[in-house]
Amino acid sequence: MLAKVAQRKGRGDVRIDKISDGNAACGFAWTWVSGNEEGLRGTTFIELNENGEIQYVREIPEPIFKPGDLTVELLKAVTADAVPKPKPEYQKQTPTTANEVAKYLFLNVQGSDVAESMRFFDDRIFYRDFNYEEPLIGKAEVKNFIETFSFPGIEFRPERFDDGIDSSCFTWDVCLDGQPETIKGLSFYELDPETRKIKYVRDVPESAIKPPILGKLARDFRPGLGVFKGVPIGSRPGGM
């Protein structure tokens, strides 16, 4: 960790874009900035012990190479022989805190009813999944995204949730049928303060290329930005 700090010392800053309001654990979305440019983005999850000391951290930067729809094709190829499982049963609920919404969607509803999941998204949802270059805007695009990634042999397995009220961060593994290794990731969910529906999502998966050579090269080449080419501050969709 000290080596990572030393590499960027005096060469750039970390902008905190969003931070969840959990007490026992929280997460934050961040962007590296240097001068008038911004670069690498990512998310960090931090969990405290009973003494208020940090006991667990997961931090994942965005992949430099974003495969887009090739991600789906690869996952479907890996799970081609998977046998469909019965849809899980769930008891319908309407949670209104961010961490409970996330838990309900991924511990209860997942794999059962896309329509029930969509009930919790705001009409103007801004959804950033770092497998893709561009964000998803609106419920129609998000619904198509969820349906695209719903096929036999893939399981989105949440691990740790924070206790945020208006926003929540949680860790997860993507488990593929018959594969011993998983794909780790982080998600950040933010609710609209009035409707209590999800208005913002950031999903960050591990790089599909392991070890992530492109990421290391970019950070060595431009340690202040962490990417090969930065963009003007605030020029990205949604400002981040």
Regions found by a protein language model. Give the residues of each.
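C-terminal and inter-domain tail/linker signature
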Residues: M1-M240
